[in-house]
A protein has these predicted regions:
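Juxtamembrane membrane-water interface segments that cap and precede transmembrane helices
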Residues: 65-81
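Hydrophobic cores of alpha-helical transmembrane segments in multi-pass inner/ER membrane proteins
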Residues: 4-18, 89-101, 160-179
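Membrane-interface helix-boundary motifs at transmembrane edges
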Residues: 18-30, 107-120
Length: 185
């Protein structure tokens, strides 16, 4: 599952980078570059920046504070304790933007704001990935899992991350498709 998530994130990063290179609006270009960079960093974190591929030893100082003794930031205790909450809230924000984009653009008269919002808003079809991943993540953070309520299974963190990565891949492919359609018209 981790390898799949890693590959999905790197493919998404590449596609979003391609979007950034092809879009004309500077604001959208910056956003696509940021999304690409974010996807790349999260993908590399998933593989502990290559440690899982090249099998190097974790630096001793990092191993002391890393819950899994790996070369990554997301397993450092302070971050690890809140990563499910952060992931769940990021996905909840994506869900909110997806559901509210059309309503927001009708209320806001500033074309400089609503045009990029409409261009960047995910398709509602992608909610099939984002909603379960967000719910699983928040259930983990608030300790609603197999040991207390019996409906989430072992290894759910990795599965939740992969479902979110599938959603990101769907988003990135829809963005590149949207850009190509806009360029043809």
């Amino acid at each position: 599952v981790e390898w799949s998530t890693f590959l999905l994130l790197l493919i998404s990063a590449y596609i979003l980078f391609t979007c950034a290179k092809n879009v004309r609006q500077v604001r959208l270009r910056i956003i696509y570059y940021a999304l690409s960079g974010f996807s790349f960093v999260i993908g590399m974190e998933e593989m502990s920046w290559g440690q899982m591929i090249f099998n190097w030893k974790t630096p001793s100082q990092l191993a002391l504070i890393n819950d899994q003794g790996e070369t990554n930031l997301h397993n450092i205790r302070l971050i690890s304790d809140h990563s499910d909450l952060v992931y769940g809230l990021i996905l909840a924000l994506i869900i909110l933007v997806t559901l509210a984009a059309n309503r927001l653009t009708k209320r806001i008269k500033d074309k400089n704001f609503y045009t990029p919002l409409l261009n960047l808003a995910p398709s509602k079809m992608l909610l099939i990935y984002f909603i379960p991943a967000s719910l699983f993540s928040l259930c983990l953070y608030f300790n609603i899992h197999e040991y207390t309520h019996g409906f989430i299974f072992r290894g759910e963190e990795e599965l939740m991350e992969m479902v979110g990565a599938f959603g990101l891949l769907g988003y990135s492919t829809s963005m590149i498709s949207r850009l190509k359609n806009m360029q043809q018209n």
